[in-house]
Amino acid sequence: MRNAFADALFEEIQKNKKIILLAGDIGNRLFDKIKKKFPKNFYNCGVAESNMTSVAAGLAKSKFKPVTYTITSFNTLKTIEQIKLDICYPNLPVIIVGVGSGLGYSNLGTTHHSLEDIGILSNIPNLNIVSPADKLETKILLKQVLKKKIPVYLRLGKKGEQDVYEKKCNSKFGKINQIKKGNKICIIGYGNVLRNAIDAYNEIKNIYKPSIYNVHTLIPLFCCHKYFLATLSILLDLKYF
């Protein structure tokens, strides 16, 4: 995923010079094309993730489109206060990219594990959370969120993930994407473990005919809005509150 992210970001910087990439002492070779062709669009902020996050907020206030990038555990939990106060409360258009999410960097020890990032960040107002399933969806969703004027947490795997989408990906920000259509069982997943759901589908498809849904955008989930309002209306009628 990280290579796909770097390629897609390079393409987008060619179109929009307001995009600024801030890296936390990682991805030096990964972003060689950006550094060589657009040296003013890349800054290595070093092992100072909290400062990098505040710098991104300042750039956003100055009409730039900042993207912060480093290992997920460092770009989320170590920077939680800056994400909340500097980016999300003012609702600034910063994209926070975490790479090697989950156990992507498991061999480097518990400091590099990120199993609780979604649970924690989902409680911060204004923060949108997107978790692509493979390299193609990473490119598609990155291009979409770069056009939006909102804070976004883009949760990536590391590398070598199996493809979910081989040639075409029609994922749209905020909307569930149906991958397989069935009629008895519904399998829901997201991120780089979605491939496991497809493997499970292949094992039971001749018996149960399951559907598979990719919830790549965890927040917001537009398809749930009308059902939330309907439920709220019923509760109000029942004087539940």
Model regions and ranges:
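Thiamine diphosphate
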Residues: 1-155, 160, ...
